Each structure stands twice: as C-alpha cells, then as structure tokens.
C-alpha cells in the first residue's frame, strides 16, 4: 500500500553479526505498530536490559572466528564463554534478576549457537543445579561462584551413551563407604559412559555428575555429585575423557567420560535434604526414587526457558534476514525482469509464513519464560517437587509448560531456518549469514 512507510532494514545479508541485534534495540520508535512488535520481541526482558546485553555482545572478544579447526574452535568457544561470564552484571548471579539469564539466551543464540550451548551448560544446568541444592551445603555456593566468574568451566554429566532415556536410571554408581564415609564413583561398563562436553580435557572443568547412590547394597536414587574433572595438566586421577566427537550441527567438545573408582568426599554429594546417619542408614524426605529423580533433574527447566527464548530469537532473526534479502532483491527472469522477489506470491507466502511463525513462537516462549521467572523464587523448595510417578520420561513431571516449549520451538526453528535459507539462494548458503548454524542449533 502506498501509504505504508518504507520497510525498515534490520540486518541485510552479509553484514556483520551485530546488525542482527538491531532487531532488539533499534526499531523506529515513531510507529506504534513497530513498538508493539518490539514489545513482543522483548518479552519478559526490559528494553534497557536488552540494550545493555547488546552492548556486552558487541565486544570483539565474543565474536566467533572463521576457518578454525574443530579443536581450536572448541577452545575459542570456552575462551569466549569465560570472557562473557566476567562481563555479565552482578544481578545474574544466583538468578537474582532472572530476566538477565533470558537476555543472555537471546543474544548468545543470535551471536553464535556454540556460545549459546556453552551458556546453557554453564548457567542453566551447572549453576542452576548448584543454586537449587546449595541450602545447608558447605561448598555449593563457593563452587557456584567459581562458575559464575568463569574461573572454572561446567560439565553436566547426565546422559549415558549406551541406552535410550538413560536419565531414567543412571548406571554410574556412587557407592557409600561406611568405613571412611566417602563415596566411590564408578562407571561399571561402556554403556554407562557419560556423554558430555569433556572433549577438551586440559581446561579447568568442574563436573556435575549424576549417579545412582548405593548404601549398604541398596539403590537409593539418582543424585548429583560435584567433582573436579580436569585441569591444565589433563584429566584428574581416575577420570577418563575422550577426544571430542565431530558434531557439525552445534560444534562443542562433546565426548565420553568414565570414572574408575574415583573416591569422593562426603560433601561432594548434593544431598538436598537426604542423609546417611551414623548407623549408615539412608533417609530421603522425598520418600521415593521417582520423586528424587524429578528433584535431581530440576535444572533442565532453566534450559527449556533459555532454549525457548534463544530459538524464538533465532527464528525472528532468520525471518528478518530473509525478508530483508527478498525486499532488496530483484529478478532477471523473463517472467518478470526487474521485479522484486516479494512481488511473487510464492515468496510472500513462504516468508510471511515464516515471520508469522516466528512471532507466534516468540510469544509462546516469552510466556513460558515469564512462568520460569516467576518460579525462580521458590525453585529450591522441596515442596515444589512433583509427586506423580515417572513413566516415559521425567520431564512432564518437572514442568509441562517448559518441556512443551522446547519440544515445539526446536522443530519450528529448524523448519523456519531451512525455509529462509532456501529462499535466499546462494546467500543463504554463506556461513556468514548463519542459517546453517541456526538449523544446527535447533536439531
């Protein structure tokens, strides 16, 4: 329509990655419709927080490098993660201002999916686990501070390679030794190898390792243990860490870890109200191994909120890139020489459909993030643990809404990024424009 203003160019293809962030920070304020859309994009995060986070992510130290080997790329990702942890405002520590974590998720996802996954593991999983279980624990707050400042890197070791749904019953054992009141952490077979970000094994990494606690021959449930996995000299005694597997979708140093009768002090156990008395009797106030499993897997709800925000931000970025490209580009086809691509119905239907999907998923992810933000104040309470039985997986018992957010956002983001990439022709295939990276992030 002739009365419509010219399309605002947010992020032309082949421009530096920071132009994508203009979607969140530089929309034209004079148009009420644009303001409304900006509010939808910001979601539960204040515009000032987005602006501050955009400034942090403009730091050249956080930019990914091109044409690196897998090993060099993994190391650079961790360097950037540690640099980012040092730059973040104090309010993110202990999730005191939970909207800051959502802002990190949004900007990290657009900046680089590998850095985003590093943030998910470091903040959502490892810091989130320590925060949830640090009440009355002598060292948990100290460990959390080391991760929050980037002094150490977190490894979340839950998945075991040999079985589907391995989180339902960890085979790695933490056997209580009544003589020394310590635990012996052991990987019984190759099926119990942990699959986690352990491939670069000469960095200072701290593991949050999930194991079946066994007391006097009785399986007492899955709990988290915290232990040093590696330092500059390599893996710690009794810890074996494989070289990284090459996963092109989202490059990170995923590999296999095992434990050969590693002796852990009693305080390595994030007991979370459970206890072993002087007579070596195990007690758990939750009363069942199913409830304990749900409780131990508390931190993934942080990840689902982060992933929902991250993927929905990526969807908006993809739609913006593709529409900007189509709006600026003409065709020399005989059917319409000099005609803009958006004049063709097939292009409009595809790209406006992508834009609509992006906004719908963004609204859904924002609502889920609001629920997560509202729930952070009570997240450490034992009373918030679900009481239902675990059947297929424990995720629905942890949070139905947040689990659904991840389940819906991931395939939507993959399909949308693929469609936008195809609609941009050769420009969509350029690594600089990140469509393939965003597809991989959603897989």
Predicted region positions:
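A general structural signal for short secondary-structure junctions and capping/turn motifs
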Residues: 144-149, 164, 175-177, 198-201, ...
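Amphipathic, small/basic residue-rich leader segments at the start of a protein or domain
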Residues: 1-142, 146-153, 165, 176, ...
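A short core secondary-structure module
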Residues: 182-242
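Intrinsically disordered, low-complexity regions flanking or connecting the multi-pass transmembrane cores
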Residues: 14, 18, 215-218, 310-314
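Internal glycine-rich alpha/beta core junctions
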Residues: 176-184, 227-443
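A gly/ser-rich beta-alpha-beta helix-loop segment of oxidoreductase catalytic cores
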Residues: 155-174
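Conserved short loop/turn motifs at secondary-structure junctions
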Residues: 125-135, 158-162, 336-340, 401-406
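Long amphipathic alpha-helical scaffold regions
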Residues: 170-177, 206, 210
């Amino acid at each position: 329509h002739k009365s419509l203003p010219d399309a605002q160019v947010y992020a032309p293809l082949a421009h530096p990655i920071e132009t994508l962030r203009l979607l969140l920070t530089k929309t034209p304020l004079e148009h009420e419709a644009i303001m409304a859309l900006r509010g939808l994009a910001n979601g539960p995060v204040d515009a000032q927080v987005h602006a501050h986070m955009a400034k942090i992510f403009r730091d050249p130290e956080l930019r990914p490098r091109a044409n690196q080997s897998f090993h060099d790329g993994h190391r650079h990702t961790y360097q950037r993660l540690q640099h980012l942890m040092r730059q973040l405002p104090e309010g993110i520590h202990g999730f005191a201002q939970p909207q800051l974590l959502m802002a990190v998720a949004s900007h990290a996802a657009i900046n680089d999916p590998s850095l985003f996954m590093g943030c998910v593991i470091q903040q959502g999983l490892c810091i989130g686990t320590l925060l949830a279980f640090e009440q009355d624990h002598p060292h948990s707050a100290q460990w959390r501070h080391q991760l929050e400042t980037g002094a150490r890197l977190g490894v979340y070791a839950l998945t075991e390679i040999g079985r589907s749904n391995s989180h339902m019953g960890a085979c790695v054992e933490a056997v209580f030794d009544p003589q020394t009141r310590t635990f012996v952490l052991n990987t019984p077979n190759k099926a119990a190898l942990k699959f986690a970000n352990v491939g670069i094994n000469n960095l200072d990494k701290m593991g949050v390792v999930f194991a079946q606690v066994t007391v006097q021959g009785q399986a007492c449930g899955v709990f988290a243990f915290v232990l040093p996995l590696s330092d500059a000299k390599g893996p710690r005694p009794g810890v074996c860490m494989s070289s990284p597997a090459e996963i092109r979708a989202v490059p990170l140093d995923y590999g296999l870890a095992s434990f050969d009768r590693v002796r852990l002090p009693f305080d390595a156990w994030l007991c979370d109200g459970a206890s072993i008395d002087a007579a070596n009797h195990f007690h758990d106030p939750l009363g069942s191994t199913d409830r304990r499993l749900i409780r131990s897997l508390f931190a993934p709800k942080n990840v689902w909120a982060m992933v929902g925000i991250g993927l929905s931000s990526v969807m908006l970025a993809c739609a913006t890139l593709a529409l900007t490209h189509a709006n600026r580009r003409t065709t020399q086809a005989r059917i319409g020489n000099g005609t803009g691509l958006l004049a063709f119905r097939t292009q409009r239907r595809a790209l406006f459909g992508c834009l609509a999907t992006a906004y719908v998923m963004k609204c859904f992810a924002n609502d889920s993030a609001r629920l997560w933000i509202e729930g952070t104040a009570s997240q450490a309470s034992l009373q918030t643990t679900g009481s239902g039985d675990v059947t297929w997986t424990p995720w629905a018992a942890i949070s139905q809404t947040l689990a659904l957010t991840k389940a819906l956002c991931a395939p939507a983001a993959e399909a949308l990024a693929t469609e936008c990439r195809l609609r941009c022709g050769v420009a969509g295939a350029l690594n600089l424009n990140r469509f393939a990276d965003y597809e991989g992030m959603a897989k």
